[in-house]
């Protein structure tokens, strides 16, 4: 699986984020930079909600690729995840199975993430890019009840480019938001003119 064409600089994905209620948000993700040597990538997440005023929110995120450098255990205490929460979310994504048995997170050995069909990641939104509304003012709510203070548990299929994930925020641990994205296939190629 080395050299996956979907996990690259400039890759784009689109899909939906669904909550426990009937609300569904349109989501577009652009990968800006992939650094496999450091097991990291970064990009933008653009969320939009079809409403009378077509509300949207764009954030910058950074990702930890699980494998050689980052483990399945969330190491950042301020993210509010515990081993139990990590287990629950990774199991939903099929990450902790071996020969049909569950494996404790602490027993999973470092591995080359690109040697497997599914790449697992944590995506953490770090900054909001939209300046139309002051969302940092605590008197105002985020559009359509979302926040960017939590993080995503992500599974990425190298063969199809499909992304699935679950959003977790420690202040709302029972709120389940499911993310599902498909790659945007760019069937164009650059035009070169020789003179």
UniProtKB/Swiss-Prot annotation:
Disulfide cross-links: none
Describe the processing and modification events after translation.
Ubiquitinated by the GID complex, leading to subsequent proteasomal degradation.
InterPro entries according to UniProt: Vacuolar_import/degrad_Vid24
How does this protein lie in the membrane?
A: Peripheral membrane protein
Q: What is its main location?
A: membrane
Gene Ontology CC terms: cytoplasmic vesicle membrane; GID complex; vacuole
- Per the UniProt entry, what is one GO biological process? proteasome-mediated ubiquitin-dependent protein catabolic process
The organism's superkingdom is given as Eukaryota
Q: Using the record for this protein, list the coiled-coil segments as residue ranges, or answer none.
A: none
Q: Where in or outside the cell is it found?
A: Cytoplasmic vesicle membrane
Name the keywords, alphabetized: Cytoplasmic vesicle, Membrane, Ubl conjugation, Ubl conjugation pathway
- Give the quaternary structure: Substrate-recognition component of the GID/CTLH complex. In the absence of stress, the complex exists as an inactive anticipatory complex (GID(Ant)), composed of Gid1, the E3 ubiquitin-ligase Gid2, Gid5, Gid8, and the RING-like subunit Gid9, awaiting a substrate receptor to form the active E3 ligase complex. When cells are shifted to glucose-containing medium, the substrate receptor Gid4 is induced and becomes part of the complex, named GID(SR4). Additionally, Gid7 transforms the GID(SR4) E3 ligase core into a higher-order supramolecular assembly (Chelator-GID(SR4)).
Q: What does this protein do?
A: Substrate-recognition component of the GID E3 ligase complex recruiting N termini and catalyzing ubiquitination of proteins targeted for degradation. GID E3 is regulated through assembly with interchangeable N-degron-binding substrate receptors induced by distinct environmental perturbations. Required for the adaptation to the presence of glucose in the growth medium; mediates the degradation of enzymes involved in gluconeogenesis when cells are shifted to glucose-containing medium. Specific for substrates with an N-terminal Pro (Pro/N-degron).
Q: Which family does it belong to?
A: Belongs to the GID4/VID24 family.
- What is the protein named? GID complex substrate-recognition subunit 4
* Organism (species): Schizosaccharomyces pombe (strain 972 / ATCC 24843)
Origin organism lineage: Eukaryota, Fungi, Dikarya, Ascomycota, Taphrinomycotina
């Amino acid at each position: 699986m080395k050299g996956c064409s979907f996990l690259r600089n400039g890759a784009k994905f689109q899909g939906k984020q669904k909550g426990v209620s009937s609300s569904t948000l349109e989501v577009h993700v652009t990968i800006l930079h992939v650094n496999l040597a450091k097991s990291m990538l970064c990009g933008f997440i653009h969320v939009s909600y079809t409403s009378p005023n077509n509300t949207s929110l764009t954030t910058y995120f950074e990702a930890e690729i699980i494998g050689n450098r980052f483990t399945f255990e969330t190491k950042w205490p301020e993210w509010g995840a515990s081993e139990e929460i990590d287990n629950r979310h990774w199991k939903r994504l099929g990450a902790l199975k071996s020969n049909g048995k569950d494996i404790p997170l602490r027993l999973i050995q470092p591995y080359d993430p690109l040697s497997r069909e599914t790449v697992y990641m944590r995506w953490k939104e770090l900054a909001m890019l939209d300046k139309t509304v002051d969302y940092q003012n605590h008197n105002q709510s985020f559009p359509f009840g979302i926040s960017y203070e939590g993080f995503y548990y992500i599974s990425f299929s190298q063969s199809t480019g499909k992304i699935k994930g679950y959003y977790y925020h420690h202040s709302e641990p029972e709120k389940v938001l499911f993310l599902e994205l498909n790659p945007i296939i760019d069937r164009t190629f650059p035009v070169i003119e020789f003179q």
